[in-house]
Design a protein with these regions (language model features):
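Transmembrane-helix motifs of polytopic, lipid-linked glycan transferases
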Residues: 47, 111-132, 170, 174
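Short helix- or helix-capping micro-motifs
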Residues: 50, 141-146, 194, 198
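Extracytoplasmic catalytic/substrate-binding loops of multi-pass membrane glycan-assembly enzymes
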Residues: 59-73, 83-95, 103-107, 251
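Membrane-interface transmembrane helices that cradle and orient dolichyl/undecaprenyl
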Residues: 129-132, 171-187, 294-302
Length: 550
């Protein structure tokens, strides 16, 4: 050993002899050749699990319709800017790309999220390998992640969530590579990733801060004691700067959005709910990530990466204090699954293959049975039967069907948000096409909420509907300054929501209501308002001004 020295390759630290033997046919060091072959073997092995995840997504992503949030995010793609009221701009750029390349079908809109999900699995396998795990560790970590309810539920919808998770996992992998190699290029890659991550979801900033503090209070603090750490931080801020400028120019609408979110949703989340849900969201894979967390915190073998466990604790406590939603923390679990795979690999190092296979089955197969609860792998009727069984026999999982109103429902809020949009848009088209050709140019469409407006924008294209007006969410940013129309097609969640408008119009006609039994929009009505009076336009301008000031 004394005659050897450490030499770092691009991918992992390897102990090379000072004068390695050579293969005399190729002239290359034998140890380097063995390492490259081994690296390729592990890469190919990880690709198996990437393929499993992608296949699972492709089999299920078109079973239900668009989610309410997906319709908003796709609409943002037609209104590109450096910021929006509820999200940073990255999802809008992806929407523009997706619509341009793949089209506007449900299946097409979820292709990029499926790719992101596959990359998360790839990086989880690579992190496991970097920690020192072999094939059993990789298999346990990747399968646990693929079938964990948290990641099955969040890994297929066109939302910032899955891309946020991707940047979290990529940041962790790059930090581990930097720790293993001290190659500063990885540090600058971290800076780029954090910058893009903050353009995806603002929670990236909190995770990055948690990791930095975790490093500073660990024995690895020397990793940040150089000018390149500051350079990486400045690079992140430079990438994120356009959104900061946009927020400043628009009076920081994200602050208003967060206040509204806290008052309408987050205030219902208790600390106890958050803790319990973190223990339940990964289902049977709980022992894997818990063991990984403990190994990162206390294991001598993983002492270099103790800062990851500290970072998890810090971001957990922050979200607990802020009444964060359970999925805000999902991006931190792949690193714990990777560490858990390594931990069980060490624990079962001398065990036979049947025992290792049994461990994988124990921590993954039960989650396979839970998939219909979080991912549309079955038709809706069979899925509802699963929910009924779940609520009767597994009451500790009843939070799955608890909506933001804190009431229990027949299905999850996410599933309910995927139904009724085609029906609603068809009613709007019925009202619009029922007007004479001479009246259509003088017709406006108004929707109560962003889901309705997004559906009319995306699904209404086939009916040649005019642009929809909505003062909810980011739609208010491009809403017209006034309504100059003789006819208004109004989409209201409830009739009571528009009763105050009736004295401001000459007459109105009810076109119909959404009847889908499982839709969150069930009961949403479509109305034709005829000859609005000036008072309606004045009310609209007042509401628009108030909305933009929030």
């Amino acid at each position: 050993v004394s005659s050897c020295k450490f030499s770092y390759s691009l991918f992992t630290p390897v102990l090379y002899p000072s004068k390695p033997k050579k293969n005399y046919l190729s002239g290359k060091p034998i140890t380097a050749m063995i390492y490259r072959n081994r690296r390729a073997a592990y890469s190919n092995f990880i690709l198996v699990f990437v393929a499993i995840k992608i296949a699972l997504n492709l089999l299920s992503i078109s079973n239900f319709g668009f989610h309410r949030d997906e319709l908003l995010h796709l609409t943002l793609g037609d209104h590109l800017d450096w910021g929006y009221k509820e999200v940073p701009p990255f999802i809008a750029f992806l929407a523009r790309m997706s619509l341009s390349i793949f089209g506007d079908s449900v299946f097409a809109s979820r292709i990029l999220t499926t790719v992101a999900s596959g990359l998360i699995i790839w990086l989880t396998g690579m992190i496991t390998r970097e920690l020192g795990g072999k094939k059993f560790a990789i298999a346990l970590a990747c399968l646990s992640l693929i079938l964990a309810p948290a990641f099955a539920a969040s890994g297929y919808l066109f939302q910032p969530v899955v891309f946020d998770q991707l940047w979290w996992v990529l940041t962790v992998w790059l930090l581990i590579k930097y720790s293993n190699t001290t190659n500063i290029s990885y540090l600058y890659a971290v800076g780029i990733t954090v910058g893009v991550g903050m353009l995806t979801k603002y929670t990236m900033a909190f995770f990055a801060i948690a990791l930095v503090i975790g490093i500073l209070i660990s024995k690895q603090r020397k990793l940040l004691f150089n000018k390149h750490a500051l350079g990486a931080a400045l690079l992140s801020l430079l990438i994120f700067a356009p959104n900061l400028v946009w927020q400043w120019r628009n009076n920081f609408p994200v602050a208003g959005h967060m206040n509204e979110l806290r008052s309408t949703q987050l205030e219902h989340i208790t600390a106890g709910d958050f803790i319990i849900q973190q223990l339940l969201v990964n289902g049977a894979a709980l022992p894997v990530w818990i063991t990984g967390f403990l190994f990162l915190l206390f294991s001598f073998k993983l002492r270099k990466f103790q800062f990851l466990a500290m970072g998890y604790v810090l971001i957990f406590l922050f979200l607990l204090q802020m009444n964060g939603k359970n999925y805000y923390l999902f991006g931190a679990y792949p690193m714990l699954f990777a560490a858990g795979g390594y931990a069980f690999d060490r624990i079962l190092k001398t065990s036979r293959k049947p025992l290792k296979a049994a461990v994988i089955i124990l921590f993954t197969v039960p989650n396979l049975l839970l998939l219909p609860l979080v991912m549309p792998v079955l038709p809706i009727r069979q899925t509802l039967a699963f929910f009924e069984f779940n609520n009767k026999n597994l009451p500790f999982l009843s939070f799955i069907t608890k909506w933001e109103d804190q009431q229990q429902h027949a299905t999850t809020q996410d599933y309910a948000d995927m139904f009724g949009w085609q029906e609603m848009t068809a009613l709007v088209a019925k009202a619009y096409n029922g007007l004479g050709a001479e009246h259509k140019p003088h017709t406006a469409i108004i929707a109560d909420n962003y889901g309705q407006a997004g559906a009319i924008h995306i699904l209404g294209a086939r009916y040649n509907l005019p642009p929809v007006i909505c003062l909810n969410s980011s739609f208010a940013l491009w809403a017209p300054e006034q309504i100059a129309a003789r006819y208004i097609i109004y989409v209201a969640e409830e009739f009571d929501d528009m009763k105050h408008l009736l004295p401001m119009v000459e007459s109105y006609h009810s076109i119909g209501e959404v009847q889908h039994p499982f839709a969150r929009e069930k009961g949403t009505g479509v109305y034709l308002l005829v000859n609005p009076k000036p008072a309606l336009n004045e009310l609209y301008k007042k509401d628009l001004e108030a909305t933009r000031k929030k």
